[in-house]
């Protein structure tokens, strides 16, 4: 497995593969890899001859300096995991490589509307940081296909819109959320939870499934439903941050025409912000998501 931290040698290798007619898949990560990331890698392998991954903790997408400082960095372990998955190349740039003139002078990519609603409203600039770094990584790696987790539902929608708007020649593949045995969505931030917090963390997913069962049962008083869900979170000492019920296609308020909705949730458990989402088929009558 090749490991490059500089752009030029990576580009030379990419050019070689392109000349050989190889199809290239790309999985961008911020490291601290878990089974969810490895599922992205395996999915990428199904779509291409060559798999490239990146490990870069992107300072542009952090609103909180402490959050950036405390983000887990486990480069050696990450490289071992990627090696075991037979990744062909890993790109490990520093902030100085990605933003040589500093963040203030960096050209940015801003996807309107979708970057400022929902989570974007409470984290101004976050999605601009995401779209900028992903666009730059696409320009560097030149992938034919890129894989992203559906756990970050709004981020995936943002990237898909950016690819359309910028006419980027890359296929975007969404990969279903990977969960722990107790239902908690896998996340690098889970490592920051104390033992007690980790035991309470699955309440987020359970509450989300409860909302889903209520919706599929015909309940559509969404504001009241969100309040009830917030109470469930607080009862388990989780602090609700955001709970949205939106049309899964538009991310706008559901209408009578909405057949597929998405529940978007975020809550603080101690100092850790957990996120999750669940798509709900409003025409469905089964209750297989219930506890």
From Swiss-Prot:
It is an enzyme of class 6 (ligase). Pathway: Cofactor biosynthesis; (R)-pantothenate biosynthesis; (R)-pantothenate from (R)-pantoate and beta-alanine: step 1/1. (R)-pantoate binds at residues 61, 155. One of its GO terms (biological process) is pantothenate biosynthetic process. Its EC number is 6.3.2.1. It is found in: Cytoplasm. InterPro entries: Cyt_trans-like (IPR004821), Pantoate_ligase (IPR003721), Pantoate_ligase_C (IPR042176), Rossmann-like_a/b/a_fold (IPR014729). Keywords: ATP-binding, Cytoplasm, Ligase, Nucleotide-binding, Pantothenate biosynthesis. One of its GO terms (cellular component) is cytosol. ATP binds at residues 30-37, 149-152, 178, 186-189. GO terms for molecular function: ATP binding; pantoate-beta-alanine ligase activity. It catalyses: (R)-pantoate + beta-alanine + ATP = (R)-pantothenate + AMP + diphosphate + H(+). Homodimer. HAMAP family: PanC. Catalyzes the condensation of pantoate with beta-alanine in an ATP-dependent reaction via a pantoyl-adenylate intermediate. The reaction proceeds by a bi uni uni bi ping pong mechanism. This is Pantothenate synthetase. It comes from Aliivibrio fischeri (strain MJ11). The gene is panC.
């Amino acid at each position: 497995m090749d490991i490059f931290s500089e752009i030029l040698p990576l580009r030379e290798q990419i050019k070689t593969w392109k000349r050989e007619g190889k199809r290239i898949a790309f999985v961008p990560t911020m490291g601290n890899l878990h089974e969810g990331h490895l599922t992205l890698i395996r999915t990428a392998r199904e779509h291409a001859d060559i798999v490239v991954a990146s490990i870069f903790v992107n300072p542009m997408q952090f609103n909180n300096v402490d959050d950036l400082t405390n983000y887990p960095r486990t480069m050696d372990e990450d490289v071992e995991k990627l090696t075991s998955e037979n990744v062909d190349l890993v790109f490990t740039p520093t902030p100085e490589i990605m933003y040589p003139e500093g963040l203030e002078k960096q050209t940015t990519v801003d996807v309107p509307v979708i970057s400022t609603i929902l989570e974007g409203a409470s984290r101004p600039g976050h999605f601009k940081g995401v779209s900028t770094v992903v666009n730059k990584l696409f320009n560097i790696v030149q992938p034919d296909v890129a894989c992203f987790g559906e756990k970050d539902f709004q981020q995936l929608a943002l990237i898909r819109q950016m690819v359309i708007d910028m006419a980027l020649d890359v296929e975007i593949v969404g990969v279903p959320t990977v969960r722990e045995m107790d239902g908690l969505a896998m996340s690098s931030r889970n490592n920051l939870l104390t033992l007690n917090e980790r035991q309470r963390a699955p309440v987020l997913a359970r509450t989300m499934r409860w909302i889903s069962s209520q919706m599929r049962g015909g309940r559509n008083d969404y504001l009241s439903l969100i309040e009830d869900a917030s109470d469930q979170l607080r009862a388990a000492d989780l602090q609700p941050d955001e709970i949205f019920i939106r049309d899964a296609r538009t991310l706008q308020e559901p209408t009578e025409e909405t057949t597929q909705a998405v529940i978007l949730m975020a809550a603080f458990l101690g100092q850790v912000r957990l996120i999750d989402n669940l798509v709900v088929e409003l025409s469905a009558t089964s209750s297989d998501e219930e506890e």
